[in-house]
Each structure stands twice: as C-alpha cells, then as structure tokens.
Regions:
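Sequence/structural signature of beta-propeller domains
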Residues: 1-356
C-alpha cells in the first residue's frame, strides 16, 4: 500500500470522490483528482482537491488544494461536512446531521450543498466558486427516521445517555428557543450520523449512516428522492425511500457503520465500514454501547438490485485495515487503484492500494 501525508488547515478530512474528466486533468497536468471535505470548516470552506501529477509514482506527486466557495447569504451558518459525491456535473456535500459527541443535535450540521464541477476546475486559480446551499433544519433527520420506521428495521436500541443528550436535549432546546425546526425531532427518534453518500444509476442519492445501525450491528443505507427540489425550494422537505442493510458487515459484538461510498457505475458500490465512534474521546454513543468502538475499518463491495424496494444485501471484503482505524473515504480510479483518505492527527493521510 502506497502512503502519502498531505497538510491542510484544518486537517480533519472526510470522504473522497473522483472529479474531472481526462481532458480537464490533462490541462492541469494531473492524472488523478479527488475532492474531500474538511469537517471542522463551514460548508463554504470545507472543500479540498487532492491531485496527482501525471507520470509520478503513486507515493509521490500529490498536492492538496483548498477550495473556497460563495454560498450567498448563508455563509458561516453550517459545520461538520462529512460526505461528498459527484453526479451530473455537480459535487454534492452533506453535513453529518448529527451533533457534538456530548450532544445535542445541532441544526448547523443539517444541510446539503453543491458546486458545479466545471467551477471547481477553476478553483486552483484562487477564486471562490458559487455554491448552492440548502439548510435542512432537521428535515433530513425527520425523513430518515420516518423511512427507518416504514421499513420496520430493528435498530440498535438508543441508550439512556444518548437519548437524553441527542433527543431530549434537542427537543427541549427547540421548544425553549421557539426554533423554526421545533417538532421535527421526535421523542421516539434515533439521532442520525451521515458519513457517506453516493448516487444510484437512476440518480437517487444513497446515504450511508455511521449511526444508527441494526440491532445485529449491520450498516444501513437510505435513499433520498427529489434532490433537485431541495435546491429549488428552501422550504421543501426531504423525502426518503428504500432502506438497505449490509447484512454481513458488522455484528452485535462489533457493530459497523458506513464511513465512505464510491461507485464506478451502475448500482455497484465500494464502501468503507468501521466503528460507530472513536473510542477514548468521550462519545456518548459509546457510553451506552461500548462495543460500538470495536469494529475495524474495512473496504467492502456490494451491489443493489435494480427492482427490489430495499432489504438486506450481501457484500464482499476487499481489505481489512487492522489497527488503522480512522479510514474515512474511498475512491477507485480508472486503473483499479483504491484510494483512501485517513483522518490522522496533524495531517491528512492518503493511502493507495493496488488491487489485483
């Protein structure tokens, strides 16, 4: 496995997606280009390009380029970017929809944004790129919880500490401050932590949840419909549909959530699965479920059937990262090399695995 350390400020990187066609990369002298998101910045400052000089060996020739955007009047109102995906000429970015490790949930993390890939190609010149930003105000939280209820998925029970910190405290805050989103978080809800996203062949957005997981510790994916409406109408409510379970990833002793998603076409996906939260960092989820910190990071592959309306699917394991725990994104290039972004102290790690 080839290894490269890149320095960005801030240095908390999540997810990875391929960007630009062959002609665009050639114009800049690159043979590979990816976008990642930095979770300690607002949406307009969360993007970075990771690019590789044409002809350089895989463990050399990488450069990180910060990208700054203009979200109009919503600057500075968002945080915690965790997922990115490319579709139909746009790069989509999602907030986690979650909260601090000690709670409560925060509306600043409930958003989706996009920039045009064509505009992103001009970012190395230093100009801010236009950004469409939709502040969801727990609308996606509501839609995902409703979809999980309709699918009758048995979830890992929400423990008493997590319920108090993430659900009860959020409801109380919304009521006390008369927030616009008051009522969208219900007492029977699960907090959701979105850390992966990708698109199905028909254009539906596929969310990968780090939390919650099933009662047996398996990761969950939820489809989002009518994505365009969220950008056309600031008051539009997200709608979610099919729910999928990766039935052979994770288990009751080492539950696993999704950390990254990638597709090279069709409904075949590469994914990173791993622990529900980082151990040793006072995460409330792990106070209730200590086993949630046990799962290794793994690269897996799976395929979603075209006609089924959700349900359980199988996967195959590509790579187990062992003690390397903070693997947060995967993208497979045209040559079959799997690239991973690693959230490491003080720098952003990029690893490349040459697949057989």
């Amino acid at each position: 496995m080839h290894s490269t350390d890149l320095h960005l400020e801030p240095n908390e990187a999540s997810d990875l997606a391929r960007v630009f066609d062959d002609d665009t990369r050639a114009r800049f002298g690159w043979d590979r280009a990816f976008v990642t998101v930095l979770d300690e910045a607002a949406a307009e400052d969360c993007l970075a390009l990771l690019v590789h000089g044409a002809g350089e060996p895989l463990d050399h020739g990488w450069e990180a380029v910060r990208v700054h955007a203009d979200p109009g009047g919503d600057g500075g109102r968002t945080e915690d970017a965790e997922a990115c995906a490319v579709h139909d000429g746009h790069v989509y970015i999602l907030g986690s929809q979650f909260g601090e490790k000690a709670g409560p949930l925060t509306a600043r993390r409930s958003w989706i944004a996009r920039v045009r890939e064509e505009d992103l190609a001009g970012a190395p010149g230093g100009q801010r790129v236009p950004m469409e930003l939709s502040r969801l105000r727990f609308g996606l939280h509501r839609a995902v919880n409703d979809a999980l209820t309709r699918a009758a998925v048995q979830l890992l029970p929400l423990g008493p500490r997590s319920r108090a910190a993430y659900v009860d405290a959020t409801i109380a805050h919304g009521a006390a401050e008369n927030k616009r989103w008051a009522g969208r978080v219900g007492s029977a809800d699960q907090p959701i932590n979105v850390e992966a996203a990708e698109f199905r062949a028909d254009g539906r957005l596929l969310l990968g949840l780090r939390y919650p997981v099933t009662a047996d510790g398996h990761p969950l994916l939820v489809e989002v419909h009518d994505l365009e409406q969220l950008f056309a109408d600031p008051d539009a409510a997200p709608r979610c549909g099919n729910v999928w379970v990766l039935g052979d990833a994770g288990d009751a002793d080492a539950p696993a959530g999704l950390r990254g998603l990638d597709t090279r076409g069709g409904d075949r996906f590469d994914a990173i699965v791993g622990d529900l939260d980082a151990a040793g960092k006072s995460a409330t989820v792990l106070d209730d479920h200590p086993q949630g910190g046990n799962a290794h990071s793994q690269h897996i592959r799976f395929e979603l059937p075209l006609t089924a309306g959700g349900g359980q699917v199988t996967s195959e394991r590509v790579h187990d990262f062992g003690e390397l725990r903070r693997v947060e994104g995967v993208a497979v290039d045209a040559g079959g090399h799997a690239h991973y972004v690693i959230d490491e102290e003080g720098h952003v790690g990029l690893r490349t695995l040459v697949l057989e």
